[in-house]
């Protein structure tokens, strides 16, 4: 995410300042800037909010004038694999200033990376294939293909695959009002 460094420097911020504004460590932010670490979707949303930009600008696929984007089967970019273990494909990355942040995610099956995340904006998850387990602080839900869940992104949550085959999930996050 070399774009992160550019956006930070455009604001005249040091890594210390960005760390203060995001609650992330300076060393982690440095790793992200150098491309040695990839943030989760929740962390990327927090970075975008702190910088006052559309989250697509952090992934480097935003275009200035796209108001419509069609993605054909088989043309999706390779999934991004953040430090959280989930991999994801950012859908509609060329549209700037959108009110929804759509992703295809491929949740991990391991327990090691079970990190609860919270972020601004409401969230809709629809399981396209496989089965997942959605964990919240006070409950756990098992979802199969065709099942969905809607919740406030501010509720800490975690998703993991529980089926023998990898799960594919459509994730749509309502963009924070500042970005909408």
Predicted stretch roles:
Residues 2-19:
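Short basic helix-loop element that most often maps to the first helix and adjoining turn
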Residues 25-37:
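Recognition helix of helix-turn-helix/homeodomain-like DNA-binding domains
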Residues 43-99:
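A short, N-terminal "cap"/entry segment at the start of jelly-roll beta-barrel domains
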Residues 77-116, 171-177:
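A short glycine-rich, His/Asp/Glu-containing loop-to-beta-strand
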Residues 86-87, 144-145, 153-179:
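Ligand-binding loop in jelly-roll beta-barrel domains
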Residues 106-107, 117-134:
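Short, conserved beta-strand element in jelly-roll/cupin
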Residues 111-114, 133, 140, 149, ...:
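Histidine-centered metal-chelating micro-motifs
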């Amino acid at each position: 995410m070399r774009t992160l460094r550019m956006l930070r420097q455009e604001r005249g911020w040091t890594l210390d300042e960005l760390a203060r504004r995001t609650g992330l460590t300076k060393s982690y932010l440095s790793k992200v800037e150098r491309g040695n670490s990839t943030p989760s979707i929740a962390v990327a949303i927090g970075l975008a909010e702190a910088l006052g930009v559309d989250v697509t600008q952090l992934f480097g696929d935003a275009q200035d004038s796209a108001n419509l984007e069609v993605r054909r089967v088989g043309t999706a970019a390779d999934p991004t694999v953040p430090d959280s273990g989930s991999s994801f494909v950012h859908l509609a990355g060329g549209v700037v200033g959108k009110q929804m942040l759509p992703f295809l995610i491929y949740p991990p099956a391991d327990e090691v990376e079970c990190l609860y995340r919270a972020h601004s904006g409401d969230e809709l998850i629809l399981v396209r294939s496989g089965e997942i387990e959605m964990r919240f602080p006070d409950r756990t839900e098992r979802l199969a293909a065709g099942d969905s869940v809607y919740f406030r992104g501010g509720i800490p949550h975690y998703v993991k695959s529980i089926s023998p085959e990898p799960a594919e999930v459509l994730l749509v996050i309502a963009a924070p009002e500042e970005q909408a």
